[in-house]
Amino acid sequence: MSFELKKEHLAKLIPGNKNVDAWHAALVDVLPKYGINTERRMAHFISQTSHESNNFNSLEENLNYSEKSLLAVFGRYFGAAPKASAAEYARNPEKIANRVYNDEFRKYKMGNTKPGDGWRFRGRGLKQLTGRENYTGFGKFVNMTAEQAADYVATPKGAVESACWFWDTKKLNNIADTDDVTKMTKIINGGNIGLA
């Protein structure tokens, strides 16, 4: 049996969002196509994606870090003298993205091998899809280039669809059905970020 997501319920789940109508339309259109059609699955999907996107308000990753925050979050990408190096990058989001998301400096590769890829393929959408490889995979799924997909993901429908694509590729409906929030969170953000 399918669960109907009502607009007034969504408004309570994403407080402070001024675009509830557009989000409701996108969710109602896209979620069923990915089997996110039960109350439990929708609850997990909306809670995880609202955490990742600040209640559906932030569709692009904020990389405007101070030097201190930059070192705390991305210090390992700044070599032997991270403090001196990070000072050059602080408050320069494009420069930060091109450094920390460049495959040259990462153990976990993202497919970012061309100049500017870090910035072009920074986190976007409800899931904060990141890296040329992820945008290429999603783009193939929706018949777009990686570059087109990066733009699409910054729209409500594209943000929902890219999150659903990720959800589906990671088989998160199965985990939602077991109500394992910790396991799901680890798959989505690589750790336990956001868990109380």
Predicted features by range, described:
Residues 2-22, 50-165:
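Peptidoglycan-targeting cell-wall enzymes and recognition modules
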Residues 4, 38-47, 178-185:
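Alpha-helical scaffolds flanking conserved acidic
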Residues 11, 28-32, 164, 185, ...:
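Amphipathic alpha-helical segments within well-ordered protein domains
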Residues 13-36, 40-43:
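N-terminal carbohydrate-binding/catalytic regions of secreted carbohydrate-active enzymes
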Residues 29-37, 147-154, 176-179:
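Short, mixed-charge amphipathic alpha-helical segments
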Residues 32, 140, 168:
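Short polybasic/polar patches that bind polyanions
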Residues 49-53, 131, 176-195:
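Acidic helix/loop microenvironments that form the catalytic cleft of cell-wall polysaccharide enzymes
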Residues 159-173, 188:
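Extended serine/threonine-enriched, polar tracts that run as long, contiguous segments within proteins
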